[in-house]
């Protein structure tokens, strides 16, 4: 019964191997960059801090953490129906995001090895962490009779090119928001163990410290290159990446509110807390952060959610393709307008915040 339900819900490349989720603007991205420009970067301004972080990576605090215990050795058929579908989707998205980080960091470590040895070793050790995370998540998927072909994913995904400074903005935020997502879920389930539907959540406390250390590494790199933070362009780009990361998470998670409900969380409240804490953390390095406490911020995101619900209904309708296009077009324009208005909201300058943290 479970197998037949699984086969109706998920498309498989071959038995037990799931077809990767279709790439959309909201799915985890794979990145590449200008490796030569990265290799030429002078990090001497903040080399002491980078060396301290490298020593943390070498210590490998989680070397023995990602080991499955007897709690996994049971049938998970009782997680079924929509909860099962959403949980597998959560595992897949998380695995894809971690694997994306592994590929980027591994390639950076390889390309910089003979030109920037400190950065190269940091990236190589971070790729070790990301590989562990991705492998652990993929193994968890196998408890639900599915897995991802990570080799196929490597070859089939489109890679987004970002210049190094944009890689730093994006990956810093990805790691820090990952920290706050994992630690928030962990703390909630420690307080409400009855909502822990699967043992992977017990691993999130140590796991999130990997994310935090990775974020600190990108913080240190940006401080080593003050031009990434100190001019008017940096302010505009920091706003852009903050908005992109926050909006993507919010729109994704609200669509999957039933998953968060299955572990006792309200998706809206959870996301608002994670966004607030990530925004606050980003203020320690970014020259500006978003005014996420302004009621307009979430009002416009909610408008986009309603638009996306209409887009889904149109996509699932039996109308001809050209009719769907003209039905969708004004909704895309509306979403674009909402994001433009969000981007133009007055940001919060962080100079005072950074001096107080110092």
From Swiss-Prot:
Record GO terms (molecular function): iron ion binding; magnesium-protoporphyrin IX monomethyl ester (oxidative) cyclase activity
Names of required cofactors: Fe cation
Primary enzyme class: oxidoreductase
Pfam families: Rubrerythrin
Pathway(s) this gene product operates in, as recorded in its UniProt entry: Porphyrin-containing compound metabolism; chlorophyll biosynthesis (light-independent)
Signal peptide: none
Entry-linked PANTHER family: MAGNESIUM-PROTOPORPHYRIN IX MONOMETHYL ESTER [OXIDATIVE] CYCLASE, CHLOROPLASTIC
Stated name of the protein: Magnesium-protoporphyrin IX monomethyl ester [oxidative] cyclase
Naturally occurring in which organism (per UniProt): Trichodesmium erythraeum (strain IMS101)
